[in-house]
């Protein structure tokens, strides 16, 4: 079922307006449906029967009242069943005079479509488990009602009355709560739960309760902020939350109930009834421990990268400043402090140093050695980081050195000891030996610096793990395939067959490159391949005039008008709320929340809009932090956009481009980094642009984060289109990521920076015939045996990613540079190098392929220009400290970008249709291919924000007696109650 179909389910009246997409989807009768209508009824009766069939397909309920039926629907049906469309009054009068005919038409439609009426007593058990699965997946409130209607519709039931749907959803929620509550009752004693409640609402020395302290978002990367984040984890560990036994339920379910504790008052919490009270308590505690633990590790990881990077930069800067003299001074100082030798021996050592200096034999320390020395001198910044990590609930294999090492350091920090015992000594390393044995330095400081780096790497490779974490669990737990049958798309392909076919492609590619060199199309310069610049693409001569006319036809529009115009076609607001808005106030708050998140508008700016309340705006912001409904809204907009004929000329629906765009953020947020180009602090949104245009996937990332993982995750996490190929830039590709993507059925096609300088990696051992003129640019260093040896482990990682147990981002981090000794990593890395070679060979000899890469990536850049125009105000709010807030900004920015492109696409199609209808003028598809929907010159994003409800009230608001049986005159907030209730 399309996401945009959900908005119609449960209606008993025809919407006042039905889009052309909905008419073609629901009121176009199939061959069997048309035959049934024509064979059963005469000309006068066919229209009513066909109308009932179309309405049942659209809404899942019979059409009871004919208060309104759009003329376009009647015309479309009459064109199929014959006859001329009557006016609505005639049709209504016909049914009023013959009520039995209405019933027969309804029953006939049920028979034709194979629908059965829902009986609550006998049919509820058949669908209850499916609805319970939705509850376990974290679906609640109005969204659960929408999912219940979808489940009933897909099982061919006639949707019952709203009250029956609500009772069914309530039964499913209570069933799951009873199961989870029973598990909590058996696993956690009432005394323990009472103690946890007392501790949560107990005040700290700073006046905050523990609940308020644990809900505080993380700060910057300063030592004080990291220490405060460590205090949150320590608070939860002291409450023995890590000892909580395993409980049923998905992480999304626990997160949903944990959110209900936000800003909770003790009096309100005491009024909660069991089992919900215990579920909310346990959910909050276990989710807080996992979330704060992950955040602390990420903060320490970023701080370590920051400190190591600064030290490296300083070491490089100091390298040219009298390096030999610096070594001489250090040697003289060491000789003077050497108390084990006599004064004469120390004097002779100094003289020897001076002679070596005069002879030029003194060599400075390497940059890496100077970097380590600088870090040891920064122990006041290093020690709090190590203390924060050691204080976590770290676990490791008993056979490794980590359990004893972590225990020794944890005990030393607890006792306040400042010595370095044998059990605290980190693993021996040649590069750290000099600092550990330097008599002028404190060996404990050097040991702490080394241990911090080693522990960071161990957490990355999961040799040290945390059972209560979400992202840093053990490698075995992450790759555990029990309970899942999902496998990677190419898991069934034998490795030998795959390598043979890939080798053949590479060999043919080398032949093409060799022939191109002989013809003079390519030139070799040592190990480089000189590729000619692409010639300007030939465009139809009439393109410029047609494009100008099409863009000139755009009507100048205010952004709020544009939002409501597209919402009237797609009903994306109903997707976000889980139902049509009840009144203008609710819809206004939702629109304001979307604008506030996408444009990062401050609360003072939003408060200028008439009719907003702080409580309603807070609710709207909270609703938008849930990514699932916003994703469905985006898909509804894209489905509408791609339904236009012009969109299908813009590219291939199985291709996409992926790239990141920076989002300006305040510097005091821990995950911000300076944009390398603009030197402005911010995070980034990683977007995937569809071949038919439009952003179908987006996610928030850090600017410094490697992007192959998000490039793969964005494709796997969407259901709009079956993407088989993704075009990326250099940052979006790595050898291992390319192999992982190929295994998952995604071919990564990178546009590499300086691709002329890239060596062509091919199999060693003579498996491929290398032309003589390409010997210098080909590097036969890939072992096919190593690929075959580690391929099974590589497929195991791919299967875990496909099943959702592991994200591609985490998998690439897990298998990354920290695991060079792992056979599965070596297999994936070597296979990725072969894929990169194959792509380079095609790029060298196929100009059309290179041009297609540039075209897709340029479209992505045009999309970023539109996003920057929408978000031109920069960081005007203080939101974004929590990951959910940053994700909401990314999702809403993609939503607004798609709104603009969908509006432009619809306008372009209307203009083309008007040309064809009025003068018979048609524009060839080869010309439409060059028409872009990303223009924004005709849109005013500034000024006073006013939404024209008078024009769209009937299309967007729930009917007087709508799906939920509630009168539209009653103002309902987006979520009932004030924040925290």
Can you annotate each of these PLM segments?
Residues 726-736, 753-759:
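Acidic, metal-coordinating catalytic cores used for nucleic-acid/nucleotide bond scission
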């Amino acid at each position: 079922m399309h996401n945009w179909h959900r908005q119609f389910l449960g209606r008993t009246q025809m919407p006042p307006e039905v889009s052309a997409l909905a008419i073609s989807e629901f009121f176009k009768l199939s061959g069997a449906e048309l035959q049934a209508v024509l064979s059963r009824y005469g000309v006068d009766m066919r229209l009513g029967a066909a109308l009932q069939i179309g309405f049942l397909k659209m809404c899942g309920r019979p059409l009871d009242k004919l208060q309104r039926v759009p003329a376009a629907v009647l015309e479309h049906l009459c064109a199929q069943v014959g006859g001329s469309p009557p006016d609505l009054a005639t049709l209504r009068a016909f049914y009023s005079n013959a009520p039995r005919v209405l019933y027969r038409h309804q029953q006939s439609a049920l028979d034709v479509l194979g629908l059965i009426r829902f009986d609550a007593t006998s049919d509820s058990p058949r669908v209850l488990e499916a609805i319970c699965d939705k509850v376990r997946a974290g679906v609640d409130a109005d969204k659960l009602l929408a999912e219940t209607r979808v489940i009933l519709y897909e099982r061919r039931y006639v949707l019952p009355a709203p009250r029956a749907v609500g009772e069914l959803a309530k039964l499913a929620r209570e069933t799951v709560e009873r199961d989870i509550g029973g598990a909590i009752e058996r696993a956690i004693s009432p005394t323990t739960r009472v103690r946890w409640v007392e501790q949560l609402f107990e005040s700290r020395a700073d006046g905050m309760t523990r609940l308020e302290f644990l809900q505080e978002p993380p700060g910057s990367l300063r030592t004080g902020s990291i220490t405060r984040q460590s205090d949150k984890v320590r608070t939860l560990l002291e409450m023995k939350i890590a000892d909580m036994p395993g409980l049923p339920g998905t992480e999304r379910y626990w997160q949903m109930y944990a959110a209900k504790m936000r800003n909770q008052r003790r009096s309100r919490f005491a009024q909660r009834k069991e089992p919900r009270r215990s579920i909310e308590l346990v959910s909050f505690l276990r989710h807080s421990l996992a979330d704060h633990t992950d955040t602390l590790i990420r903060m320490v990881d970023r701080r370590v990268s920051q400190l190591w990077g600064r030290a490296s930069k300083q070491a490089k800067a100091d390298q040219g400043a009298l390096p030999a003299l610096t070594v001489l001074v250090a040697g003289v100082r060491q000789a003077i402090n050497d108390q084990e030798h006599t004064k004469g021996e120390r004097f002779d050592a100094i003289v020897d140093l001076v002679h070596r200096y005069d002879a030029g034999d003194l060599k400075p320390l390497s940059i890496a050695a100077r970097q380590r020395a600088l870090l040891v001198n920064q122990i006041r910044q290093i020690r709090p980081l190590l203390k924060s990590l050691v204080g976590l609930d770290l676990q490791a294999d008993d056979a490794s050195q980590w359990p004893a090492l972590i225990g020794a350091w944890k005990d030393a920090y607890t006792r306040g000891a400042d010595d370095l015992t044998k059990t605290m000594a980190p693993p021996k390393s040649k590069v750290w030996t000099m600092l550990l044995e330097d008599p002028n330095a404190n060996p404990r400081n050097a040991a702490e610096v080394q241990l911090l780096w080693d522990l960071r790497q161990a957490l990355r490779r999961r040799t040290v793990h945390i059972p209560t974490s979400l992202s840093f669990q053990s490698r075995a737990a992450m790759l555990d395939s029990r309970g899942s049958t999902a496998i990677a798309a190419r898991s069934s392909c034998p490795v030998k067959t795959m390598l043979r076919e890939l080798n053949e492609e590479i060999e043919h590619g080398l032949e093409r490159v060799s022939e191109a060199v002989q013809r003079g199309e390519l030139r070799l310069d040592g190990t480089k391949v000189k590729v000619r610049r692409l010639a300007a693409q030939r465009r139809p001569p009439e393109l410029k005039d047609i494009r100008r006319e099409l863009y000139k036809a755009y009507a100048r529009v205010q952004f709020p008008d544009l939002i409501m115009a597209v919402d009237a076609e797609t009903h994306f607001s109903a997707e976000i709320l889980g139902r049509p808005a009840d009144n203008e106030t609710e819809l206004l708050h939702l629109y304001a929340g979307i604008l506030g998140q996408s444009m990062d508008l401050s609360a003072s700016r939003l408060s200028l809009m008439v009719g907003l309340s702080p409580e309603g705006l807070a609710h709207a912001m909270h609703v938008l932090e849930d990514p699932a409904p916003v994703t469905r809204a985006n898909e509804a907009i894209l489905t509408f956009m791609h339904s236009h004929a012009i969109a299908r000329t813009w590219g291939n629906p199985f291709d996409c481009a992926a790239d990141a765009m920076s989002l300006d953020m305040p510097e005091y947020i821990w995950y911000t980094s300076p944009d390398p180009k603009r030197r402005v602090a911010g995070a980034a949104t990683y977007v995937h642009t569809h071949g038919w245009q439009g952003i179908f996937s987006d996610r928030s990332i850090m600017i410094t984060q490697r992007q192959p993982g998000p490039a793969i995750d964005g494709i796997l996490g969407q259901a709009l289109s079956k993407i088989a190929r993704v075009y990326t830039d250099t940052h979006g590709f790595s050898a291992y990521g390319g192999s992982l993507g190929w295994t998952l059925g995604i071919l990564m096609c990178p546009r590499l920076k300086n691709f002329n300088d890239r060596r062509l990696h091919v199999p060693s051992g003579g498996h491929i015939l290398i032309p003589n003129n390409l010997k210098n640019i080909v590097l036969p260093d890939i072992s096919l045996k190593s690929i075959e040896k580690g391929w099974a482990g590589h497929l195991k990682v791919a299967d875990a990613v496909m099943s959702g147990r592991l994200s591609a981002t985490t998998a690439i981090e897990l298998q990354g540079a920290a695991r060079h000794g792992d056979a599965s990593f070596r297999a994936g890395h070597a296979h990725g190098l072969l894929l990169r070679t194959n792509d380079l060979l095609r790029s060298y000899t196929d100009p059309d392929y290179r041009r297609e890469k540039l075209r897709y990536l340029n479209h992505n850049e045009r999309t970023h220009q539109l996003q920057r125009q929408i978000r031109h105000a920069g960081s005007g709010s203080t939101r974004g400290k929590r990951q959910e807030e940053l994700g909401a900004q990314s999702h809403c920015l993609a939503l607004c970008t798609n709104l603009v492109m969908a509006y432009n696409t619809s306008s372009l199609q209307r203009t083309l249709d008007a040309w064809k209808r009025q003068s018979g003028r048609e524009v060839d598809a080869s010309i439409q291919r060059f028409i872009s929907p990303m223009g924004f010159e005709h849109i005013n994003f500034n000024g006073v924000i006013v939404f024209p409800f008078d024009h769209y009230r009937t299309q967007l608001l729930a009917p007087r007696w709508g799906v939920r049986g509630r009168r539209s005159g009653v103002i309902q907030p987006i979520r009932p109650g004030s924040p925290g209730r």
